[in-house]
C-alpha cells in the first residue's frame, strides 16, 4: 500500500518542485499513517468480523473447572460443608446470596452461550431475578445470568418455584450439569422454557454427552404470568418430571441410559447464536427481560426434609399476584 502512495507523492513532488528526497520522506510518513488507519479499521470492525479471543472476565472463575481444582479467590469464602457433601437443601431466594453455597457466574467462554454477568443477578425480598441484555462483552453480543449451587449432587428430587422470561429467543432454565471440566462425561437433566411459547415447558436429559429426546409438555397457562412449581425426580433407572405435583413425563433406562454422575444444580437465563434460532426463536425479546426464581430445593434420595412444595400453593400464589 505504501508503494502507490510513494509514487503518487513523487508525482506531486515533481509538480510542486519538491526534491526526490523530500517526496520520499513524505511518502514514508503517509504510508505509515495509511497503514495505521487500516489497522485501526480492523480493530474497530463490527462484532463478528474480527478474530475472536475469549478470556474469563474473572481470573478466579470457578465454573467449568474440575471440581477438585476450583480455586478460591481472595475474599471468597470456602464452600460450606453441607454443599461440599452434596447434602439436601432448601433455599428461598428472598434470603439473599450465600457465597459459601452459591456462585454467581461472571465470565465468558467459547460456546454458543452469552456472557454471564454477576450484575445480572438481582435479589429481592421474595425472589431472585436473572436478566438478559443485548450488550458487547468481549466477543459476545449478549449477556445473561447463571447462578450455581456449589457442590455436586446426585440422585434425588429437585424443585423450583419460578416464572420464566418472556420473549422470543430467551431460555429460562433449571438443570443439573456435569462435564469433562468437572472430571466426568457430560450428564444433564433439564427443565427449560422457551420465551417464544410459554404455554409449554420443555424437558430433556443427556448421558455421557448423548441426548434423550426433546420433550414439549403443554401447560394450561402462560408460565411467564403465573408462579408455578416444576420438579424432577432423578433415580438410577428413571427420571420423572412434574408441574405443580402432577406427573407429566417419565423416562426410563430402557428409553435411554439415565445420568449417573453427581452434578451441579444451576439456574440460567440465556439466548444463543444463529445455530439455536430454529430452536428458541429469533432473539426479538425486550432488552432487559427477566426470569424470577422464588424457591429451589434438593432432597437427596433416602432423605426426609423440607422442600419448596411443602409451603407452595399455586392457587394462593397466583391469587396474590392478581390482587397486586
Regions found by a protein language model. Name each.
Residues 29-40:
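Hydrophobic membrane-insertion alpha-helices, especially the h-region
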Residues 20, 44-324:
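GH16 jelly-roll
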Residues 20-29:
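Bacterial N-terminal signal peptides that target proteins for export
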Residues 1-21:
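N-terminal secretory signal peptides that target proteins for export/translocation
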